[in-house]
UniProtKB/Swiss-Prot annotation:
Similarity comment text for this entry: Belongs to the peptidase C2 family.
Region entry Domain III, spans: 344-496
Protein name from the UniProt record: Calpain-5
Function (record text): Calcium-regulated non-lysosomal thiol-protease.
GO BP annotations, alphabetical order: granulosa cell differentiation; luteinization; ovarian follicle development; proteolysis
Active site: residue positions: 81, 252, 284
Classification lineage: Eukaryota, Metazoa, Chordata, Craniata, Vertebrata
Record keyword Cytoplasm present: no
Cellular-component GO terms for this entry: cell surface; cytoplasm; synapse
Recorded superkingdom: Eukaryota
Domain C2: 499-617
Single GO MF descriptor: calcium-dependent cysteine-type endopeptidase activity
Calpain catalytic domain sequence ranges: 26-343
EC number: 3.4.22.-
Length: 640
């Protein structure tokens, strides 16, 4: 994964460290200096900040003291509980934090070799489709010899402070981390995809079955190494950081550090009882103000759990900000969950393997409608199709598809007043099985995301077999920015961008001809087909000028619904389009009949019910069956 890591600001960690050791100096980062510019992008600085190296703060600095734990972290003066909550989640996953903090043993202070320390660290973050290696020096902002931002329980443990500094460097300054989104940090730590869940939507509070399904999904993400966060929405500025009677805090991001089904009871009998309780462990980045309801640290409910089970769960009575609660109570009090899924693309895994397609694009403005790529959402029908378009295929009868679009992070532009995200989203349309060019008219909408001014938008949906077009858009037309599209399917989806509006003219066009007409054929279904006692196993083939489109087989019915479309750019208008119906058999497929379609340039999408004919164009009495077809035809190749 990290062989393709890109050096941020072209700073090579190894080369910089070697140069410092050779010159016997401590590294000073020219790209993120120890100055107010690295602290603030606006406003008046507070108390005088002194930048100090760890050995100026304590006698025996360490990256880690007794390993790394979610208990290590405490939020500082900047309002970035979202980042600290993400760090708490990261600390609970060794395989993940060792990717963010590479070669940590080499970066650790070595008391036996003090001359090997050069005051330089580096950390890896996933940013807009690639891993970047961020170099920082070890000068940290302090007031009265105390770290003013993220810090550890132990005064001589420092891993979280330089990680935060590297993340602030990416954002432009520490102040740019104020008021962020936990989902963004979780993605930046893992390269996964974040799925936000609104616990107030639908009837989760009252529907036990839906609640149980969601718990299983949360448990699955946690058990497969994903990261999870939860929060209580603050509806007004006055609500921010308000403490509820139960001890929870509004507008605060909590890290989910464990998810499990807890066995109730004592002794051998407990192993044979089926009673288990769905429970969640969370942590407040402040390290205090914890849950005081049922199953809190000193709650009598813990008497229902055996001592061995409590030890296995790590239940302690400490004011460390970590606490257990039932999943039911979590759904009652919390309003939002963020699941960061680590998408498994390894063929060697025992778990489900996904195929990922990753494409970059952009919303760009242009006066020419055919070159404009910033058309806004579907509300703007005149310009909607002037957006980037991406086509992909679902090759199974039905497949779960994960789709995420991300806009380039903008925190680093806050200094110029440009740090706000665009409102973005996307629609997915089922299109013709042979489409190769951009859409110009509406087709069946298969799914759509919400529109929100967040860095990324995610959708998980089930799609039947076929070809689809994703149209990612900004909410309003005319807005510009870069985008990253990620599509995950069970088998390769052949996802690619549609760039051309119509077939290109080449040097052969004058010899072989150029299309004069575009025709869309939509075969909806059939009725009254010749069948056996179990019904026909039929499919259709649409033929036009040597090109074929075939539907899936519809089994065991004489009234199949094919719902298959083909689009054809036609040169020989006198040749009819043929729709053939076949019966799928073991040895040889059986021809059931066909119809010929003759079109005119002004044909609309009228529904035609046509009787099947034999190959000679006759309609014998022993050839039953009717095919329902819609045809759309135009002399303008960009009409469909």
């Amino acid at each position: 994964m990290f062989s393709c890591t890109k050096a941020y600001e072209y700073q090579n960690y190894s080369a910089l460290k070697r140069a410092c050791l050779r010159r016997k100096v401590l590294f000073e980062d020219p790209h993120f200096p120890a100055s107010d510019d690295s602290l603030y992008y606006k406003g008046t600085p507070g108390p005088t900040v002194r930048w100090k190296r760890p050995f100026d703060i304590c006698d025996d600095p360490r990256l880690f003291v007794d390993g790394i734990s979610s208990h290590d972290l405490h939020q500082g003066q900047v309002g970035n509980c979202w980042f600290v909550a993400a760090c708490s989640s990261l600390a609970s996953r060794e395989s993940l934090w060792q990717k963010v903090i590479p070669d940590w043993k080499e970066q650790e202070w070595n008391p036996e070799k003090p001359d090997s320390y050069a005051g330089i660290f580096h950390f890896n973050f996933w940013r807009f489709g690639e891993w970047v290696d961020v170099v920082v020096d070890d000068r940290l902002p302090t007031v009265n010899n105390q770290l003013i931002y993220c810090h550890s329980n132990s005064k001589n443990e420092f891993w979280c402070a330089p990680v935060e500094k590297a993340y602030a460097k990416l954002a432009g300054c520490y102040q740019a981390l104020d008021g962020g989104n936990t989902a963004d940090a979780l993605v930046d730590f893992t390269g996964g995809v974040s799925e936000p869940i609104d616990l107030t939507e639908g009837d989760l509070a009252t529907d036990e079955a839906k609640r149980s399904q969601l718990f299983e999904r949360v448990l699955k993400v946690h058990s497969r190494g994903g990261l999870i966060s939860a929060s209580i929405k603050a509806m007004t500025a006055a609500d921010m950081e308000t403490r509820l009677a139960c001890g929870l805090v509004k507008g605060h991001a909590y890290a989910v550090t464990d998810v499990r089904k807890v066995r109730l009871g004592h002794g051998l009998l407990a192993f044979f009882k089926s009673e288990k309780l769905d429970m969640i462990r969370l942590r407040n980045p402040w390290g205090e103000r914890v849950w005081t309801g049922p199953w809190s640290d000193t709650s009598e409910e813990w008497q229902k759990v055996s001592k061995s089970e409590r030890e296995k769960m790590g239940v302690t009575v400490q004011d460390d900000g970590e606490f257990w609660m039932t999943y039911e109570d979590m759904c009652r009090y919390f309003t939002d969950i963020i699941k960061c899924r680590l998408i498994n693309t390894s063929y060697l895994s025992i778990h489900k393997t996904w195929e990922e397609a990753r494409l970059r694009g952009a919303w760009t403005r242009h006066e020419d409608p055919q070159q404009n790529r910033s058309g806004g959402c579907i509300n703007h029908k005149d310009t909607f199709f002037q957006n980037p378009q991406y086509i992909f295929e679902v090759k199974k009868p039905e497949d779960e598809v994960l789709i995420c679009i991300q806009q380039r992070p903008k925190r680093s532009t806050r200094r110029e007043g440009k740090g706000e995200n665009l409102a973005i989203g996307f629609d997915i349309y089922k299109v013709e099985e042979n489409r190769q060019y951009r859409m110009h008219s509406l087709q069946h909408k298969a799914a759509s995301s919400i529109y929100i001014n967040s860095r990324s938008v995610f959708l998980r949906t089930e799609l039947p077999e076929g070809r689809y077009v994703i149209i990612p858009t900004t909410f309003e037309p005319g807005h510009t920015g870069e985008l990253l599209l990620r599509v995950f399917t069970d088998v390769p989806s052949n996802c690619r961008e549609l760039r051309l509006d119509e077939p290109p003219r080449t040097c052969w066009s004058s010899l072989c001809g150029y299309p004069q007409q575009v025709t869309q054929v939509h075969v909806l279904g059939a009725a009254g087909l010749k069948d056996s006692s179990t019904g026909a196993n039929s499919y259709v083939i649409i033929k036009c000028e040597g090109e074929k489109v075939r539907s899936a087989v519809q089994r065991g019915t004489s009234t199949p619904e094919y719902n298959v479309k083909g689009i054809f750019y036609r040169k020989k208008l006198s040749q009819p389009i043929t729709v053939q119906v076949w019966n799928n058999r073991v040895l040889k497929d059986e021809f059931l009949g066909q119809v010929h379609l003759k079109t005119a340039p002004d044909d609309l999408q009228d529904l035609h019910s046509l009787h099947l004919q034999d190959r000679s164009g006759r309609q014998p009495s022993d050839l039953p069956g009717i095919v329902a077809v819609r045809v759309l035809c135009s002399a303008s190749l960009t009409a469909v």
